[in-house]
């Protein structure tokens, strides 16, 4: 197949297939190629961590050909082999590929192209000509955007609108590819791109947790469940914390999300007491908003206005696209636009198909790949500063990250000068809420003890699991790197997994996520120092260790990480700082301003997610909401009191022993 090419001129999407055959993947209509000459079929594959995606050509009787699409779960690889044979894709010039002395090569991208070479050779008699995954994804996206009218669209307020893309102003753009994990690439031209970052909280995380929480067997089943659910059953919103009067006084929307799964921590319900539909809805909103937030921050750092989303975990799902679109629009104040693609799950396979006929192609070997940095260098690099430079004269400006049920990030520029600039709904409430559902633990301390004895690699999918022992060196990802938190979960039976391993995976995924977002916010604001505080972090060395490691990785050691414990005790410096000389005494003292410390990542309510359960019950719901708020406040205050008592005892013991202030882990 190596000498054949695909003629893309005049390509168009046809809802009614020109060749009289429907798409093998009902959500991905064929692309008609009117000028493609009659020829044996071409087949290309993208073998990912979860799915095998196929793109192949089929000649049309009246001239031209179609690009057709099909996908299979990787664990059902035999079904893929059977399909390839049934469609006649293993024949060339009337003979079976495997019947010749030399095996025919199929273009293939993705980590599975390296791991399953022998399977394809044995079952189909073909060898896999490996194409770099990121090259393929970018090539596939550029093909759709440049050659296929109507391939790009937006989805806002339930309305899908086609986007006209001019090849003259396409570049640069940000491409967010949502697979088992998420890769974020800056594309500056044809075959010109850079993988700037990624996150291990992606489609594999959603699906893995969905299996454990809802018992669903497929991702499509999970999406169907989410459509029927209500995330407000489990999510903590601003009204639950502040009450309606404070919300009205401060001009806050009562439905502003503060903490995903945050209501679970004060509830006596067990996992079996929640509806699978509500659990699915909460999972979907939690992780789609998180992906959108990271995408917004990266686009802001790179000064990009247009963000394209692709990947097999979007699947044209309306709520997924709506959540991402709403969050991007809100954070950017309508200056950025989330754009989606037809055939978004087939970018890698399309790119591999485009590589047929490339004279410069060679079969890639992971061991020979050139390593390069996978983190984009900021336009305003953050200089490393020694920790001994902290004093009254140079402490400002800094980023204060408060980790409560949600996460709030505040820029402090001087004494009494601070502003909440962003937050995250994936905070301590999310960690403990999910921990209670998955492990049955009753407290954060118990959860941390479980995590100490667990192994996150029992459920987390690593780069090595996808690419093999050499990892993905071209973009600087060693085999040990987590590719998708909970991405290795294959069973829907929670009892098959150790609670210790689940706890370890939870702690890893969310603490690294908090660290990553904090780094991006500091980078965007040009801040060199980050102070962390909050009941879910202070005094917990395991949590501080994870966040410190995350910041060190993302910033390459150029951002200072300090933890405030017990009214501003900076243990990392062996010095005592009060909120007053940090310039935030007003923030700590005035109850009316406590909404600044909420972790809400956005404000307002999506039209597609009405407060049905709150609106239908009238006054009774208001009373129930107040009771729920009081229960939550009581639980938080009780936990805070226990923490302070424990810290006080430990501090006294260490002061007696050392004769100097305690030093916490940095």
From Swiss-Prot:
Q: Which family does it belong to?
A: Belongs to the type II pantothenate kinase family.
Reactions performed catalytically = (R)-pantothenate + ATP = (R)-4'-phosphopantothenate + ADP + H(+)
Task: Provide the top EC class.
Answer: transferase
The EC number(s) given in the record are: 2.7.1.33
Q: Which UniProt keywords apply?
A: ATP-binding, Coenzyme A biosynthesis, Kinase, Nucleotide-binding, Transferase
The name this protein carries in UniProt is Pantothenate kinase 1
Q: Which GO terms describe its biological process?
A: coenzyme A biosynthetic process
Activity regulation as described: Regulated by feedback inhibition by malonyl-CoA.
User: Which Pfam families does this entry report, sorted A to Z?
Assistant: Fumble (PF03630)
Specify the species: Oryza sativa subsp. japonica
Q: Which InterPro entries match?
A: ATPase_NBD, Type_II_PanK
- Source organism's superkingdom? Eukaryota
**What task does this protein carry out?**
Catalyzes the phosphorylation of pantothenate the first step in CoA biosynthesis. May play a role in the physiological regulation of the intracellular CoA concentration.
């Amino acid at each position: 197949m190596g000498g054949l090419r695909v003629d893309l001129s005049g390509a168009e999407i046809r809802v009614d297939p020109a060749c009289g055959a429907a798409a093998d993947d009902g959500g991905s209509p064929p692309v008609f190629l009117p000028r493609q000459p009659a020829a044996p079929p071409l087949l290309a594959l993208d073998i990912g961590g979860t799915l095998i995606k196929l793109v192949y050509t089929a000649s049309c009787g009246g001239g031209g050909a179609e690009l057709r699409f099909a996908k299979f779960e990787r664990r059902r690889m035999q079904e893929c082999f059977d399909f390839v044979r049934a469609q006649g894709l293993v024949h060339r010039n009337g003979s079976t590929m495997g019947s010749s002395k030399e095996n025919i090569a199929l273009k293939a991208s993705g980590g599975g192209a390296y791991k399953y070479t022998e399977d394809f050779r044995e079952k189909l008699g073909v060898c896999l000509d490996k194409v770099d995954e990121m090259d393929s994804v970018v090539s596939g996206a550029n093909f759709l955007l440049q050659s296929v009218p109507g391939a790009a669209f937006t989805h806002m307020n339930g309305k899908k609108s086609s986007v006209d893309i001019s090849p003259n102003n396409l570049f640069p753009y940000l491409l967010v590819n949502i697979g088992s994990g998420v890769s974020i690439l800056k594309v500056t031209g044809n075959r010109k791109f850079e993988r700037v970052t990624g996150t291990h909280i992606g489609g594999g995380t959603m699906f893995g947790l969905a299996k454990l929480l809802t018992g669903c067997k497929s991702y499509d089943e999970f999406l169907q469940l989410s459509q029927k659910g209500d995330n407000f059953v489990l999510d903590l919103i601003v009204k639950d914390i502040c009450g309606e009067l404070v919300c009205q006084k401060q001009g806050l929307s009562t439905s502003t999300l503060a903490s995903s799964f945050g209501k679970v921590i004060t509830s006596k319900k067990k996992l079996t007491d929640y509806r699978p539909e509500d659990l699915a809805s909460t999972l979907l909103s939690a992780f789609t908003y998180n992906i959108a937030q990271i995408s917004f921050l990266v686009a802001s750092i790179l000064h990009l206005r247009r963000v394209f989303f692709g990947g097999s975990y979007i699947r044209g799902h309306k709520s997924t696209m709506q959540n991402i679109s709403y969050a991007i629009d809100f954070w950017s104040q309508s200056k950025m636009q989330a754009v989606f693609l037809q055939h978004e799950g087939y970018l890698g396979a399309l790119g591999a198909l485009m590589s047929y006929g490339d004279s410069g192609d060679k079969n890639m070997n992971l061991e020979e790949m050139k390593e390069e940095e996978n983190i984009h260098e900021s336009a305003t690099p953050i200089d490393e500063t020694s920790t001994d430079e902290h004093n009254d004269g140079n402490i400002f400006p800094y980023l204060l990250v408060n980790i409560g049920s949600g996460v709030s990030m505040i820029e402090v520029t001087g004494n009494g000068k601070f502003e909440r600039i962003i937050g995250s709904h994936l905070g301590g409430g999310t960690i403990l809420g999910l921990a209670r559902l998955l492990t049955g633990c009753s407290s954060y301390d118990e959860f941390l003890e479980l995590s100490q004895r667990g192994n996150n690699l029992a459920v987390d999918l690593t780069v090595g699991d996808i690419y093999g022992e050499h990892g993905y060196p071209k973009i600087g990802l060693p085999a040990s790197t987590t590719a998708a938190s909970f991405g290795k979960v294959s069973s829907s039976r929670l009892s098959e997994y150790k609670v210790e391993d689940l706890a370890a995976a939870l702690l890893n995924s969310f603490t690294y996520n908090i660290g990553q977002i904090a780094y991006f916010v500091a980078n965007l604001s040009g801040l060199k120092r980050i102070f962390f505080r909050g009941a879910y972090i202070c005094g917990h060395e395991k949590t501080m260790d994870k966040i410190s490691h995350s910041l060190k990785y993302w910033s390459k050691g150029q951002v200072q990480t300090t933890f405030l414990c017990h009214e501003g005790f900076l243990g990392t410096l062996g010095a005592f700082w009060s909120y007053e000389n940090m310039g935030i005494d007003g923030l700590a003292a005035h109850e009316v301003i406590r909404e600044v410390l909420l972790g809400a990542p956005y404000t307002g309510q999506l039209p597609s997610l009405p407060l049905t359960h709150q609106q239908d019950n009238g006054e009774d719901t208001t009373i129930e909401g107040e009771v729920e708020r009081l229960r939550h406040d009581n639980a938080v205050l009780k936990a805070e009191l226990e923490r302070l008592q424990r810290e006080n005892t430990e501090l006294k013991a260490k002061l007696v022993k050392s004769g100097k202030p305690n030093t916490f882990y940095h």
